[in-house]
Structure formats: structure tokens, C-alpha cells
């Protein structure tokens, strides 16, 4: 049984640094690369990173890397790997994905077939099974992925199962919701802290508000879901339970939060409430049905985060233009508030009425979007305290 694994956390383009910080916060050294964060760890690291990483897509084991310019090199390279340390007799091991980029080998179905054949042959040899008899595959599943970039093959096993953005709290979603891991990453990129008010004026199914409450309460995002590794015989149930129990103990149940989510659609507000209930944070968020232009607040030093409907999500261009203009008018008086708006509309700034202080390119799935960042005026600590005392 292996003691240490080469691991990667896959991540949407533009969010790698966020995941790198999360991995380091768990105590693992890492290297941040395009679309991935590399680190080493034991079985506990596999469990912890799946349970705790908010902004990653998946955690994968790198079984091996080798040059592969021909199918023979691919076969021999896959065959040479230590599959017996991962796959017990009876395991299901589909080659679930093959991706070839800038490589001599480019026929992905053939890459999958050759890789499968090599793993089968290795396991037949290790478990002393006759070559002519197919291996039974009726046990736990180990999804194998093959990536060939510039004639170098990387062979991986997915430990997560469904993508990590699936937290297990979403009862229903809106038309084109933001993914939970993207929302968590944007909150970490923003200047919001749990002691600041937070408003999402176009909250949809409530993702930003729910993820914010979970961050503030230090709730592990994977506590309410299961993972592929939980079925594997070399990951002990006792260790899984220990890590889950430890995570439950770390939840901050004392903190008081000021989070509000609004949406013009009453049905979405009800969905958001149900999602917050399922996530265990319904007491932390005030959801209400409201139009953007009706938003008013006397509070200071807050953060507005919005993923408003945009071109690809809403066919009504005139409606989008009007909404962005209203946002600009409503947000303008909130001088001490920072605003973060995620949209794919490249004309957003002109419709909103002011240039962003900073713009960050991200991908919501395959859709290129920009995070427009408007920073609020700095507030002295005593002013925030005064305002708090006035509220009490």
C-alpha cells in the first residue's frame, strides 16, 4: 500500500492561486500551475482536500508520467505503472477520459482502448489470472484519466467522484447558476470578511450567500456529500470518520453574520431559502424578494457581490442594459461599499456607468466572464464600531 501520493487539485482558469492558498492552509506544500495545483500527501490528504477545498474542481492521484509518441510507448508506459497498489482484484476501472493536445497521438478513443488493455494485462499478471479470461469488474470504481500534452502522458485516478462544486445542498437551481466553487473563490478574491455586511442583489438560488455563510462558519464544503474514495478498500472508514468528525468540531457556531440575498423572482427566493436550509445556514441569511432599484442601506463598509443575468443567460438585451444602469445608480451612493460584479458582457462598464478599479478574467464552466471590481472608500475602525453600536 502506498504511503505518499502525487496529487493534483484541478481548478478553473484564473482561480489557481486561490486553490494554492487553500492547499497550503491545510498544511501541504504545493506548486501552482495552469489549471491545477500539485502537492504530495498521504491517504488523509486525499480525504482532507476533498472535504475542505472550496474552489477546486477535483482531486486526482497522478499514477505516473512518461513520454508517449507511439501507441507502443503508451502501452508500455501504462503497463509499467504500479496498478497493483491502487486497484484490488474485481475493481472497476474505466478509462473515463482521454485528452490529447499538441501530440503525435491524437485519436482519443484509441488512447483509451490501449490504456485499458495495458492496465488489464498488468493486473492479470499481478493477480496471476489467465490472459484469455476477462477480469471481473464488479467492485469499487476507480476512474482513470489519460492526458497527453506535447507527447508526455500523465495517468491519473479521480478520487472525488462528482465534481467538488456539488456540495449536496442545492435542492433546485436557477436558469444558469454560478457554480459553488466559483462563488467561493470569488468571495475569497473579494475584500469581504465575516464582520462586514454582504448583499447579493441578484441572488438567484442563493449560492454566493450560502458559500459566504459556510466560509464564515468554517464549515467544510464537502461535509454533506460522498466521494469516490469512500468505496476504496485502502481508505479506512475509521480515518474518513475521524476527518469528518474533526471538520464538524471546527464549525464556528458563535459568529453573527449580516448577509442578505435579494431577487426579483419570488420563486428563486424560495429556492434560495430551501438551499440555505439544506446547507445548515438558513439563520445566517436574510432572503427577500426585491428589485435591484429598490436596494437601500445605511450600513457602511459592506460588500456587494452579484452575478446578474447577462447575454448568454438572458436573451433580452434591453433588459440587461437597463439592469446594469440601475445597478450603477443604486450602488453609486454606497461609497464605502466594495462591489464585485461577474458578467460576460464586455460593455458592462459603459452600461453600469463607471470604470472598474480592477478586472479579472475567469471561466464559469466554458464561458469566459470578467469579475469587475469596484473598491469602497476605506473606513476607520472607530467609524465601523460607532455604526455597530448605533445598530444595537
Give residue spans per PLM region.
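C-terminal edge-of-domain segments
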Residues: 144-160, 372
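A short, flexible beta-alpha/helix-coil linker loop
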Residues: 100-103, 162-163, 309-313
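Flexible, glycine-/basic-rich loop-and-beta segments that form/coincide
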Residues: 48, 53, 162-167, 171, ...
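C-terminal catalytic and target-recognition region of SAM-dependent MTase-like enzymes
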Residues: 290-392
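Non-catalytic nucleic-acid substrate-recognition regions in nucleic-acid-modifying enzymes
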Residues: 2-142, 391-392
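SAM-dependent Rossmann-like transferase core, predominantly class I methyltransferases
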Residues: 155-189
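Conserved S-adenosyl-L-methionine
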Residues: 178-296, 312-313, 317-319
Amino acid at each position: 500500500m502506498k504511503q505518499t501520493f502525487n496529487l493534483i487539485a484541478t481548478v478553473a482558469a484564473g482561480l489557481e492561486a486561490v486553490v494554492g492558498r487553500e492547499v497550503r492552509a491545510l498544511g501541504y506544500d504545493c506548486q501552482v500551475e495552469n489549471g491545477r495545483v500539485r502537492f504530495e500527501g498521504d491517504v488523509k490528504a486525499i480525504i482532507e482536500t476533498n472535504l475542505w477545498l472550496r474552489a477546486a474542481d477535483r482531486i486526482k492521484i497522478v499514477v505516473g508520467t512518461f513520454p508517449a509518441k507511439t501507441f507502443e510507448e503508451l502501452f508500455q508506459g501504462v503497463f509499467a505503472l504500479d496498478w497493483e497498489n491502487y486497484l484490488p482484484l474485481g475493481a472497476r476501472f474505466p478509462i473515463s477520459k482521454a485528452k490529447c493536445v499538441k501530440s503525435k497521438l491524437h485519436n482519443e478513443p484509441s488512447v483509451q482502448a490501449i490504456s485499458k488493455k495495458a492496465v488489464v494485462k498488468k493486473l492479470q499478471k499481478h493477480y496471476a489470472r489467465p490472459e484469455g479470461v476477462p477480469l471481473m469488474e464488479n467492485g469499487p470504481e476507480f476512474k482513470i484519466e489519460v492526458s497527453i500534452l506535447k507527447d508526455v502522458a500523465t495517468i491519473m485516478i479521480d478520487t472525488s467522484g462528482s465534481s467538488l462544486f456539488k456540495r449536496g445542498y442545492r435542492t433546485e437551481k436557477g436558469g444558469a447558476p454560478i457554480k459553488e466553487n466559483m462563488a467561493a473563490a470569488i468571495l475569497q478574491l473579494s475584500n469581504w470578511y465575516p464582520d462586514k455586511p454582504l448583499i447579493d442583489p441578484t441572488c438567484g438560488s442563493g449560492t454566493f450567500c450560502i458559500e459566504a455563510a459556510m466560509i464564515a462558519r468554517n464549515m467544510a464544503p464537502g461535509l454533506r456529500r460522498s466521494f469516490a474514495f469512500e468505496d476504496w478498500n485502502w481508505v479506512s472508514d475509521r480515518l474518513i470518520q475521524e476527518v469528518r468528525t474533526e471538520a464538524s468540531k471546527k464549525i464556528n457556531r458563535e459568529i453573527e453574520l449580516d448577509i442578505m440575498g435579494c431577487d426579483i423572482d419570488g420563486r428563486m427566493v424560495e429556492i434560495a431559502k430551501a438551499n440555505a436550509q439544506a446547507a445548515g445556514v438558513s439563520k445566517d441569511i436574510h432572503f427577500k424578494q426585491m428589485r435591484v432599484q429598490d436596494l437601500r442601506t445605511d450600513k457602511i463598509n459592506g460588500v456587494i457581490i452579484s452575478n446578474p443575468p447577462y447575454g448568454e443567460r438572458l436573451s433580452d438585451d434591453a433588459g440587461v442594459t437597463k439592469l446594469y444602469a440601475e445597478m450603477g445608480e443604486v450602488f453609486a451612493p454606497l461609497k464605502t461599499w466594495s462591489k464585485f460584479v461577474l458578467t460576460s458582457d464586455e460593455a458592462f462598464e459603459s452600461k453600469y456607468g463607471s470604470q472598474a478599479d480592477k478586472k479579472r478574467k475567469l471561466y464559469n464552466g466554458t464561458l469566459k466572464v470578467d469579475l469587475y471590481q469596484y473598491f469602497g472608500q476605506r473606513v476607520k475602525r472607530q467609524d465601523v464600531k460607532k455604526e455597530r453600536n448605533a445598530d444595537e
